[in-house]
């Protein structure tokens, strides 16, 4: 772990708070400055990776554009907790973005590979 890196731990639903938007803003900023960043989606955070969000009905901006921009900024280290998907009746096929499924038992080692962790 000689190189500094950040893991953004996304645990909240995509709408209802600013947490998801703030996490994506940090990821895009890190990408713009070529700072190593990874995102882990777990708990209700897995809903951020689903397509066809329609937040206009609740007066929120759609996160889909920001999620799609991750690839343009070379932010491609996306992980999703397999257990969180299963608990919500979802599978990897439901995700709008490619993400590596991680077993709950392997999350601690994923966290340990990063020098900083920010939880949202």
At which residue positions do the language-model features occur?
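Residues at the starts of beta-strands that form the adenosine-phosphate
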Residues: 5, 36-38, 77
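Short, glycine-rich nucleotide/cofactor-binding loops
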Residues: 7-21, 53-54
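Histidine-anchored nucleotide/phosphate-binding helix
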Residues: 20-39
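N-terminal beta-loop-helix "entrance" segment that forms/cooperates
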Residues: 45-59
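A glycine-rich helix N-cap at a beta->alpha junction
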Residues: 56-82
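Short, well-ordered beta-strand core segments
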Residues: 78, 117-118
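Short acidic-hydrophobic, aromatic-tinged amphipathic segments that line or gate anion-handling sites
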Residues: 98-105
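An anion/phosphate-binding loop that grips the pyrophosphate of nucleotide cofactors and donors
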Residues: 114
